[in-house]
Each structure stands twice: as structure tokens, then as C-alpha cells.
């Protein structure tokens, strides 16, 4: 027997070609003396089984016994009833005409069928009778499923599709979720199904506009509250600070200075001096900056001194003293140190002083430590070694720090002789005011 599809060549048969189908004794007498059957069966089975098979002369009914060890999976080992030429084990077996589907057979009357016109006619009749409340209860669904031979899932899906179709065609004759409390408690799953249907309609088809409008109406109070809070915060900021729209750092600095002066000095002549209509001769840079400032709102005239600080007004919070009337002597130095910390004036005058010189005195192009005419009336001796700050910052820093340590008593005396200032950065109008500002800055640098 050969297996050309498997790549094996012809194998010599164990029996002669003129074998008869019933020649049991002949085949046994022919194969037994030669020992061929015993050798084959000993390779397949053990020695006792091979001897028993040879004794019973079953060799004629085992045609492929030599090939069984090679292909044990091709078929059963004993082909006792059929002749070898009828069907081989490697051939395909006939299959049944159909396979059973699920737990029901095709002829079973209890098998659920698809929705047809006959089955849906019952559902349509029930829907027409209950147009005002097209939500069947669980018992009604079971009854309709038995009548139409459909499952509960099919019945529920059909009613959901029917309600959605009627909503789409604007033929709704019922109020959504119109069930009573008793039915709702008994059949809570139906309400969940209705909510799921409404969510699908809103998300997928955007049909149920009434639910959307009701949700928007429910959301309106929250939005009104948020909008009111936004307008309130904006109005408070506009009343307290009229310069929130200024983006230039110099303008913000001037805004903080003006606010501090208005808090500490409740006198109209200071505001007149800071207004854009003032006739007092002023430097060009200060005139330009004061022209940019809008007129202060009238609410600030009666503003109390100890008002509540705002979170968004950091400069005002930093420059406002705790009790300006009780401590007039320390107010100027505290404000000076706070403003210096706010505007990055740190105790290293050599390396970090260049960034400050371009803020309040950019139009005059003055370097506070390099201009001799600015400090000529003070008689301070430690400004001369610090003339090379821009080119050699580290060396100048070390020299200036040693000089400031040695000259600390002189700066303290200067601070005592200077009258108390409201802020460290007032608009400069006279030369003497410039001397006072420079002295305050140098004293703050040396003391820190």
C-alpha cells in the first residue's frame, strides 16, 4: 500500500494478491510458517499478543498492520467488517447535512424564531392600544413573548425601536417616564432602559431636544453664579486697582508707588502733583510715565488706610506697613527693604544692579553707583571703589562688600538724619529728592 500524498513509496503487501475474502485457513497456513505475521504483530504488540493473533489466524483481517506504527492516527487498528478497498482511514468521512443550532433543533416548535410580520402584528396591536404609555411591564413582555414565540430580549428591543421611531417621526403621544411609583418600584429595570434610550438619542441622533433644553436650564444657575462671581471679582479689582491693564514693568512699579502714597498720605495736593495736568517742572521721563497713568477713580478718595489686602495686588501687599501711624520712624526703612526684595535689589550691588538701573531711571540713563553728580552732596566715600561694577562684577562685589561693612556707622547716621519717606521710589522732582532716594537705597544695601 502506498501513500503518495504523504511522500511514502509503495510497501510490499503482507498477503498474496490472489487472497480470498474468506480464506482464513489458507492465509493462516501461508503466513504462519514464514513467521511474517508474528514479526509484524510483535512490532505492533507485545510477544503474547502476537502469538495469540498468529494462533487465531487473524492475519488476513489486519491488512495495514505494518503501517500502523508509522501512522497510528489515520484510523482504527482493527478493520474487521469492511474490506480494505472500501474506504481508507485517511479519506474524508461523510458529514451530516446540518449541525444543531444551540439547544433547539430545526424541527423543534419551541425554538424562537425571527421577527416576522405575523409575530410583530401582535406587538403592533398592543402598541396601538397603549399609545399613551408604550412601556410594557415585565409580565406583559413575558405574555407577548409567549404569544409571538420570541425571547424577552427581542420583545424589549422591538418596543425600544418602535418608541425611537415614533419620536423621530414626531408622533409621540405619551409623556416620557410617565409611570407611577408603584410600577416604578416593581419594575425598576424599565426605567433604567428608558434612561439608556434617552442617552442614545441624545448622543447618537440628537433628537430629544426637550431633554437637552431642560438640562441647559438646570445648568443655567451654576453658570449665572460663576458669571456673577467673575463680574464681582473684576469690579473689586477695578475699584481697588485701576492699573491692572498695564503690562510694562515700569508702569507696574509706578502703580504700586502711587497706591502707597494714596494710602499713607490722604491729602489732595499729592494727587494733584501726580496727575497729568500738573504744572510743576518735572524731568522728561517722569512726565512721560505720569501721562500714561489714567486718572484715579473717585472711590479712592474715601478709602480707609487699613483696608483688606487683595491677593492679586502683590506690590500693595508688600509695601503696606502693619501700622503706619504708630511706627512712623520704621515705616520708610521697612518699605524700602520690601520694595528692594520685590524688585530684585539684593545685597550684591555689583552683579545684580544692572537689571534695576533700566527700570525707573531709564530715560535719564543714570547708573546709581557710577554717577558722581547724583551723589555729590552726600559725601559718601565708598562709592569711588565701586566704579567698575559692569566690567568686573565679582571683584567689585568683594570690594563693595568690604567697604559697606567698614562704613556701616556712617550709613546708619545718614539714615537717621534723613526725614521719613513714604516710599523708596517716589517720582523725582528736585535734586535734593534724588539725593534722599540714593541715600535710602545705599543704606538698605549696606544694612542687608
Curated annotation (Swiss-Prot):
Induction notes from the record: By a combination of a neural inducing signal (nog/noggin) and a posteriorizing signal (bFGF). Inhibited in the neural plate by foxd5. The anterior limit of expression at the future border between the prethalamus and thalamus is defined by mutual repression with the anterior repressor fezf2, and also by arx. Induced by retinoic acid (RA) during kidney development.
UniProt DNA-binding region: 108-170
Single GO term (MF): DNA-binding transcription factor activity, RNA polymerase II-specific
Name under which the protein is recorded: Iroquois-class homeodomain protein irx-3
Intracellular or extracellular location(s): Nucleus
Organism: Xenopus laevis (African clawed frog)
Encoding gene (name): irx3
Entry keyword set: Activator, Developmental protein, Differentiation, DNA-binding, Homeobox, Neurogenesis, Nucleus, Repressor, Transcription, Transcription regulation
Tissue-wise expression: Primarily expressed in the developing central nervous system (CNS). At gastrula stage, expressed in both the superficial and deep layers of the presumptive neural plate with expression spreading to the prospective hindbrain, spinal cord and midbrain-hindbrain junction as neurulation proceeds. Not expressed in the anterior neural plate and CNS expression in the tadpole excludes the forebrain. Outside of the CNS, expressed around the closing blastopore at early gastrula stages and as gastrulation proceeds, expression switches to the anterior lateral plate mesoderm.
Amino acid at each position: 500500500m502506498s501513500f503518495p500524498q504523504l511522500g511514502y513509496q509503495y510497501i510490499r503487501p503482507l498477503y498474496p494478491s490472489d487472497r480470498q475474502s474468506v480464506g482464513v485457513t489458507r492465509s493462516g497456513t501461508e503466513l504462519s510458517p514464514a513467521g511474517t505475521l508474528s514479526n509484524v504483530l510483535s512490532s505492533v504488540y507485545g510477544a503474547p499478543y502476537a502469538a495469540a493473533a498468529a494462533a487465531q489466524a487473524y492475519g488476513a483481517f489486519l491488512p495495514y498492520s505494518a503501517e500502523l506504527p508509522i501512522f497510528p492516527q489515520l484510523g482504527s487498528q482493527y478493520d474487521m467488517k469492511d474490506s480494505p478497498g472500501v474506504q481508507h482511514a485517511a479519506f474524508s468521512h461523510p458529514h451530516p447535512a446540518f449541525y444543531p443550532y444551540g439547544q433547539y433543533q430545526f424541527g423543534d416548535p419551541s425554538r424562537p424564531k425571527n421577527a416576522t410580520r405575523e409575530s410583530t402584528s401582535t406587538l403592533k396591536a398592543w402598541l396601538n392600544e397603549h399609545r399613551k404609555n408604550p412601556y410594557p411591564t415585565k409580565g406583559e413582555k413575558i405574555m407577548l413573548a409567549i404569544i409571538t414565540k420570541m425571547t424577552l430580549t427581542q420583545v424589549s428591543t422591538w418596543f425600544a425601536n418602535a418608541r425611537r421611531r415614533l419620536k423621530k417621526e414626531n408622533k409621540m403621544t405619551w409623556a416620557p417616564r410617565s409611570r407611577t411609583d408603584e410600577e416604578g418600584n416593581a419594575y425598576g429595570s424599565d426605567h433604567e432602559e428608558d434612561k439608556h434610550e434617552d442617552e442614545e438619542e441624545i448622543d447618537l441622533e440628537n433628537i430629544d431636544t426637550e431633554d437637552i433644553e431642560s438640562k441647559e436650564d438646570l445648568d443655567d444657575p451654576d453658570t449665572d453664579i460663576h458669571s456673577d462671581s467673575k463680574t464681582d471679582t473684576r469690579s473689586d479689582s477695578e475699584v481697588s486697582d485701576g492699573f491692572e491693564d498695564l503690562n510694562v514693568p515700569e508702569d507696574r512699579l509706578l502703580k504700586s508707588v502711587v497706591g502707597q502714597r494714596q494710602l499713607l498720605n490722604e491729602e489732595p495736593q499729592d494727587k494733584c502733583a501726580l496727575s497729568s495736568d500738573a504744572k510743576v517742572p518735572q524731568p522728561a521721563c517722569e512726565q512721560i510715565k505720569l501721562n500714561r497713568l489714567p486718572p484715579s477713580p473717585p472711590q479712592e478718595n474715601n478709602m480707609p488706610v487699613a483696608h483688606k489686602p487683595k491677593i492679586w495686588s502683590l506690590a500693595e501687599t508688600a509695601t503696606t506697613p502693619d501700622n503706619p501711624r504708630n511706627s512712623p520712624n520704621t515705616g520708610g526703612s521697612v518699605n524700602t527693604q520690601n520694595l528692594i526684595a520685590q524688585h530684585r535689589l539684593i545685597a550684591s550691588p555689583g552683579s545684580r544692579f544692572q537689571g534695576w538701573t533700566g527700570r525707573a531711571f531709564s530715560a535719564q540713563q543714570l547708573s546709581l553707583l557710577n554717577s558722581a553728580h547724583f551723589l555729590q552732596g552726600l559725601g559718601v566715600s565708598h562709592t569711588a571703589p565701586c566704579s567698575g561694577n559692569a566690567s568686573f562684577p565679582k571683584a567689585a562685589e568683594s570690594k563693595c562688600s568690604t567697604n559697606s561693612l567698614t562704613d556701616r556707622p556712617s550709613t546708619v547716621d545718614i539714615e537717621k538724619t534723613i526725614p521719613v519717606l513714604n516710599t523708596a521710589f517716589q517720582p523725582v522732582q528736585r535734586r535734593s529728592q534724588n539725593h534722599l532716594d540714593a541715600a535710602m537705597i545705599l543704606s538698605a544695601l549696606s544694612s542687608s
